[in-house]
Regions:
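N-terminal secretory signal peptides
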Residues: 20-79
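Sequence contexts marking disulfide-bonded cysteines in secreted/extracellular proteins
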Residues: 29-31, 41, 102-104, 116-118
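Flexible glycine-rich surface loops and low-complexity tracts that mediate binding to linear polymers
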Residues: 83-111
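OB-fold/S1-family single-stranded nucleic acid-binding modules
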Residues: 105-130
């Protein structure tokens, strides 16, 4: 009886793990998104959470330019518009500074927030928001 319970428990646990790992590869990266309007490029900036839409924004360091991570208009269920690891690090009290590989959903226009997705990030430092 105990052996059967242990075996059943292991089967349930292993089945749950394989279900999680099987679903992950199906999420496509930002760079593969079908609605991109240009090439991806690296932006050295500060990623923060704001009140409003889009909530996650990337401010290019040395400029007043703000890029918005699309979370509605260009959100498709099978694509990731921002790496989950970055989202886990962000909250209203901190910001991330680093080099972000971004891909554009809209063209850059003066006075308008350009909508993007983030493919990856390097040299990321978390700091308290000022």
């Amino acid at each position: 009886m105990i052996k059967a319970s242990v075996a059943l428990s292991l089967l349930v646990i292993c089945g749950g793990v394989s279900a999680i790992s099987v679903s992950s590869p199906f999420e496509k990266s930002c760079r593969q998104h079908p609605q991109l309007v240009g090439k991806c490029s690296t932006v050295h900036g500060t990623l923060s959470v704001y009140n409003g839409n889009p909530a996650v924004r990337l401010r290019r360091i040395g400029t007043k330019r703000i890029l918005g991570v699309s979370d509605q208009r260009f959100k498709l269920p099978e694509y990731s518009n921002i790496p989950e690891a970055l989202m886990k690090q962000l909250n209203g009290e901190n910001e991330l500074v680093g080099d972000f590989l971004v891909c554009p959903f809209t063209r850059s226009k003066p006075g308008e927030m350009q909508l993007i997705c983030i493919e990856s990030a390097k040299n990321v430092v978390t700091r308290k928001r000022a």
